Amino acid sequence: MSTLLNPYFGEFGGMYVPQILMPALRQLEEAFVSAQSDAEFQAQFTDLLKNYAGRPTALTKCQNLTEGTRTTLYLKREDLLHGGAHKTNQVLGQALLAKRMGKTEIIAETGAGQHGVASALASALLGLKCRIYMGAKDVERQSPNVFRMKLMGAEVIPVYSGSATLKDACNEALRDWSGSYDRAHYMLGTAAGPHPFPTIVREFQRMIGEETRAQIMEKEGRLPDAVIACVGGGSNAIGMFADFINETSVGLIGVEPAGHGIETGEHGAPLKHGRVGIYFGMKAPMMQTDDGQIEESYSISAGLDFPSVGPQHAYLNSTGRAEYVSITDDEALEAFKTLCRQEGIIPALESSHALAHALKMMRAAPEKEQLLVVNLSGRGDKDIFTVHDIFKARGEM
């Protein structure tokens, strides 16, 4: 099938889906391309982002974290967005696209529950019926978000198959869509999956980097030395990176979850420790067994617990334009606690991975003058019970 936009990033990406879904993807691509040049659509999207979601979000300079070093550290505050995370940006765009295509239902998958909450709020706002697939394990560890989704009228469907986490929820959502795309739009939650989703999600998240550029120029008079973001599927990171890709002086650093440690095999870092394969409608690095089965990923943070990664990140990694590192559960928890204690901000566990790497960079070279920006992709309200139980067990509370 010929496409309007390039479905590949180097060798990564593509549309590896059953034939039955091709017309749905084609319709979505056509709607997206026409919406991008439709002033009325763009005005509506911008208005929702500003007056409903609360954009632009703040760029906050850390007052205390950098003490004793020559680092200047800023946080891009996506945690302040309505819904609690960056997810709200692109679901508003996709919900408007769904309406444009005449769809009446939304199907979504969610891990941490943030994309589920965002899908539920956008559906409630725009009068769409919403059903959300969520791994049974995630339903358990993210109960506040499950209740939020239900409050906003969404149906939450627990998925018990496989590892009962995000990858299984993705499979069920795609299965549902293949039988209902005439009336339903699949609101994919990250910059991964079959074309045109990685491109759509990036474009509906790129205001993160655009705002950051304008704000840092105003505050510091120059671009940052590096922007740092956590990577599960990779939507918050690609939203931050997109506007800086052609600025070679700006380092792009993506942080994958090392879980219990890469050497244990219990992690979610396919970019550096996976092999290329076909999964979830795309060609990308993924965690696989020796016989090519998708392996279970692991992270303390449900939103990073994904065995693959978006194709543009795979491409940026292969060309060396972006650097990808990994952070363990323990390092992320330490960063979580540090930000709470020293800056009075409770970050999501996902975002804590990015922060942990920034702290590592800072401590490794305290004498180095550097300007860093961390994308604080979400707030940590959803994680307080998980963190409470861990700290209590360690005697830290």
Swiss-Prot record:
Pfam families in the cross-refs: PALP
GO cellular component: cytoplasm
Modification N6-(pyridoxal phosphate)lysine, positions: K87
UniProt pathway annotation: Amino-acid biosynthesis; L-tryptophan biosynthesis; L-tryptophan from chorismate: step 5/5
Quaternary structure (record): Tetramer of two alpha and two beta chains.
EC number: 4.2.1.20
Family to which the UniProt record says this protein belongs: Belongs to the TrpB family.
Keywords: Amino-acid biosynthesis, Aromatic amino acid biosynthesis, Lyase, Pyridoxal phosphate, Tryptophan biosynthesis
Protein source organism: Cronobacter sakazakii (strain ATCC BAA-894)
PROSITE patterns, A to Z: TRP_SYNTHASE_BETA
Family annotation (InterPro entries): Trp_synth_b_CS, Trp_synth_beta, Trp_synth_beta/beta-like, TrpB-like_PALP, TrpB-like_PALP_sf
Biological role stated in the UniProt entry: The beta subunit is responsible for the synthesis of L-tryptophan from indole and L-serine.
Protein name (database record): Tryptophan synthase beta chain
Catalytic activity: (1S,2R)-1-C-(indol-3-yl)glycerol 3-phosphate + L-serine = D-glyceraldehyde 3-phosphate + L-tryptophan + H2O
The organism's place on the tree of life at top rank: Bacteria
Presence of the UniProt keyword Nucleotidyltransferase in the record: no
Cofactor(s) recorded in Swiss-Prot or TrEMBL: pyridoxal 5'-phosphate
Top enzyme class: lyase
GO molecular function per UniProt: tryptophan synthase activity
PANTHER family, sorted: TRYPTOPHAN SYNTHASE, TRYPTOPHAN SYNTHASE-RELATED
